[in-house]
Amino acid sequence: MQNQVIQLGNIEIGNNKPFVLFGGMNVLESRDMAMQVCEKYVEVTQKLGVPYIFKASFDKANRSSIHSYRGPGMEEGLKIFQELKETFGVKVITDVHEIYQCRPVAEVVDIIQLPAFLARQTDLVEAMARTGAVINVKKPQFLSPGQIGNIVEKIAECGNNKVILCDRGTNFGYDNLVVDMLGFNIMKKVSQGCPVIFDVTHSLQCRDPFGAASGGRRDQVTELARSGMAIGLAGLFLESHPNPNQAKCDGPSALPLSKLEPFIAQMKAIDDLVKSFEEIDTSN
């Protein structure tokens, strides 16, 4: 199978390369907390030898309730991202929701993310592609893995071939998600080998049908992440929080920051083992 590799500074993102950790927090809650979380991730990934990219949102524009916290906004968020880059030397990924956000965000961060709920909005996809930035496409919960190729084609038609694909679970009836482990390789094939990563924490979301915010199953984050890493992926997408029960968004799915090192150590061990195997072609 063809494997494309995206070079981001000294980080190689590819399905046959050592996995890259896209990690941080769901939404920027404060400058100080962002610094705390990023510092911990940098400490752990440097110790374990894992390539690392910081992730967080400056605006959670798709919150269920009008009363839910959304974030500091683009202007303040970009200031925080710039400080993180200067302080820790990290690459940064964040999402955009509006066409006008694409260029200013791409001037600061290293990867711009297409949210799952917006992944079929052609005007937004084209605006993101034309920045020339690396784009992380979140596969919509309602879309089959094979359909992701159409989104990749839209980006390519704008002259951008720097695409990462991310699975964050698939609708399973109402208010629940499951992860189709067979879908990862389908996404690789229909995209001609784009790097594929796994958003394990969002895949753990589940809802109270009448609630205003998502619930989650963080007690299962390790077993689900182990399963995904056994496929052989370009990266793992992970959200953590110093105190998940007090997080302003998606705390029930977040890995406690104190558990980061043993968690990532296990993921690296699985990735190293799986990618040491010779590929077996069972198609004929």
From Swiss-Prot:
The keyword Protease does not apply. It comes from Histophilus somni (strain 129Pt) (Haemophilus somnus). NCBIfam families: KDO8P_synth (TIGR01362), PRK05198.1 (NF003543), PRK12457.1 (NF009109). This is 2-dehydro-3-deoxyphosphooctonate aldolase. One of its GO terms (cellular component) is cytoplasm. The lineage of its organism: Bacteria, Pseudomonadati, Pseudomonadota, Gammaproteobacteria, Pasteurellales. One of its GO terms (biological process) is keto-3-deoxy-D-manno-octulosonic acid biosynthetic process. Its EC number is 2.5.1.55. The keyword Zinc does not apply. Coiled coil: none annotated. GO terms for molecular function: 3-deoxy-8-phosphooctulonate synthase activity. Pathway: Carbohydrate biosynthesis; 3-deoxy-D-manno-octulosonate biosynthesis; 3-deoxy-D-manno-octulosonate from D-ribulose 5-phosphate: step 2/3; Bacterial outer membrane biogenesis; lipopolysaccharide biosynthesis. Belongs to the KdsA family. It is found in: Cytoplasm. Keywords: Cytoplasm, Lipopolysaccharide biosynthesis, Transferase. The gene is kdsA. It holds the Pfam family DAHP_synth_1. It catalyses: D-arabinose 5-phosphate + phosphoenolpyruvate + H2O = 3-deoxy-alpha-D-manno-2-octulosonate-8-phosphate + phosphate.
